[in-house]
Amino acid sequence: PAIAPSVFTASGHLGGSYSEIASTAVEHALSKNLTLTATYLFAGGVRLPRTVNVNMLPPVLLTASNAMQLGIAQPAPQQIGRPVFPPERLARQFDGIYQWQNQAHSTYNGLSLALRRRLANDIEFSANYTLSKAIDDASDFDEQPQNPYALRKERALSANDQRQRFVFSGTFDLPFGDEDEPGATRKQHSLATDVFGNIEVAPILTIGSGRPVDPLLGFDGNRNGAFPLSSRPLGFARNSLETPGQAEFDLRVLKFFLIGGHGKLDLVAESFNVLNHTNVTALNPVFGPSLEPIPTFATPNRAGIGRQMQFSIDFEF
C-alpha cells in the first residue's frame, strides 16, 4: 500500500507567547567597598511553542494477545504493557499531522546571593551563588510529547534546569611595582618589581550542577510517529537523567610595559578551562528495546571544550 504523507500545520488558536516575572532583592553594605545582595526571581512562561501530532487515535495498552491487531508482529519487551497508538489515523489521507501549538508552560524559581567588592586598592571581585529550579512541559518548539493524549505527564524538569551554580570573577594587581600610567614618574625598581610588577590577573571560576537529559528507547516504541523520538523506557519520566556537575576555571593575565613618556605595551595571555577539566555536557539517552538497558545507557557521550590558550599584544600611544 502507498504510504500516506505527513504534513506540518499551525494551530488555529495561536497567540503570542509571554512571560510573567516577579522579583525582589535586598542589599546590605558590609563595609565601604563590600556589599551582599539576596535576590529572588520568579519567571513563568505562558503559551510557549511545541509540536503535537494531532492525527493519532487514542492509544491502546499493548499486550501479547492484541499485538497483531495493532500491527506489531514481534513486540519488543519495552512495548508490552505500554500504551501504543493504532496504525489507523483520524484523517486517513495523512500519516502524521504535526501541529505547531503554543500551549506549553514553564516556571522558574531562583534565589541568588551575590557578594561584590568594588575596585579599591587594585582589587575587585564578585561571587554569585544561585539555587534554582526550572520546570516545563516542552523545552523547545520541535519537542513532541510521548502521548498527545496525556500532555500533563510531560511536565517535568526543564532541559535548561541547573539546580546550583556558583561564579567567581575578579581582577587583582600583583603587589609589586606601581600602576603608573604613561607620562608618570617611575619609581626605583627591584628585580621582583621588574619581573612581577605591572601584572593584572583576572580569574573566572564557574561551578554548576548537572543538567537534565531525556531518556529514550531509541525507536518509536509507542508508534506515535514523533521525530525527534519521544518514546521513553518504562518507569522513566521526562528529563529524569542528569549529567555530572561541571567546573571550569578561566584565567587572564596582563603585563604592561611603559615605553617612553606616552606609550604602553600590553602582553596578554588568556586560557579557558585552565585545568583541562572534562565537563560532560550530554549522556547517551538510548535505553534500548529490552527491559535491561544497553551498556552505554546514561554514559557520557559529549564533553565541553578542553584547555584553550590565546595570546595578544596591544600597544597604546
Where does each model-flagged region fall?
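Short, solvent-exposed micro-motifs at the edges of structured domains
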Residues: P1-F317
